[in-house]
């Protein structure tokens, strides 16, 4: 049995799940009666984790956004980690959304502070886009996971490599 256990807190999302959610949204877009005859598309820029919603009506653009968010939730991606970049209008309305897939330094410091304030017998350290938490008991690590989830940060947090 290991004398120390650890896990990583990461902001990474599963890119395949994001693709699957957007594909499901496209299928629903094709089958929805209220969106028939309206030009609407969903485009994904994988390198920048940005997706673009394009629709010929601003009201339908909001419907399209709701469809995408519902599909993301069903796929286990936290919608709080999605930031609206900008809205463009012209012949078509466009909405650019960015999926945060990293923990920024401010959020990492908040998480680290919450872990230290919990007075559990664990140590945490910020390692780039991840936070490593080390402790002797798995119960303490599970308590840390619960504390971090209760922080309600606008991130897609995932807990990896529990050893």
UniProtKB/Swiss-Prot annotation:
One of its GO terms (cellular component) is cytosol. The keyword Transmembrane does not apply. It comes from the Bacteria. The keyword Nucleotide-binding applies. InterPro entries: DUF520, UPF0234-like_C, UPF0234_N, YajQ-like_sf. GO terms for molecular function: nucleotide binding. Gene3D superfamilies: 3.30.70.860, YajQ-like, domain 2. Keywords: Nucleotide-binding. HAMAP family: YajQ (MF_00632). Belongs to the YajQ family. PANTHER family: UPF0234 PROTEIN YAJQ. Nucleotide-binding protein. This is Nucleotide-binding protein Cla_1551. The lineage of its organism: Bacteria, Pseudomonadati, Campylobacterota, Epsilonproteobacteria, Campylobacterales.
